[in-house]
């Protein structure tokens, strides 16, 4: 049985990077461009894209993706893509491609892609394009691994949303006390954390991510929605990251929910 603690130092290294380099800059990175490229370059220096990473067990990789997505989900998505399909883009539907390139991965197939870049609701730091896909032939099937990483991203986004909401609630005062002192507010956060811990634990031992997908989508919806409620009117101000968590979670939901149909 895998002992994840054997990889504690590696997970901590990437977790510390996420906390110090991604979280404080997440709104800037969300705009893409140089901030996104700069973060990727630093990860390259840390060895995230070295061939040795391929030998790391999947549950450890899942933990690392969780850590990165707590900082900035688009960065986590890029790392996950690199660990699965390398330099290929990922076709998320028959027309929508994430990290577009001339060759894309499409449901276990290698495909040719031509399209135009588009702006999207969430995961804005990732480039996206709409266009035409032409299947060229079979390719190694990475659908299952990609889904594991997508759910890991939902976990990280949910954790970040709850953390931001809790920190805000402990500072924001109403009726001469912090709003964290109100039972309902604490209940939102505690319930969200129970969802997160349940999905996180199951994800690390599961052999089939599809069995967790519906619960993971519900978890992310609850955590990001309640975080928005806790921030109140401030949740709609771009200076706070809580709206980004909601957008990123909704974007992943729109990409993944069709798998449940």
What are these regions (language model features)?
Residues 1-71, 148-261:
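Alpha-helical interface subdomain recognition
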Residues 2, 75-77, 87-167:
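FAD-binding core of flavoproteins
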Residues 71-81:
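Short, flexible active-site-proximal loops enriched in glycine and acidic residues
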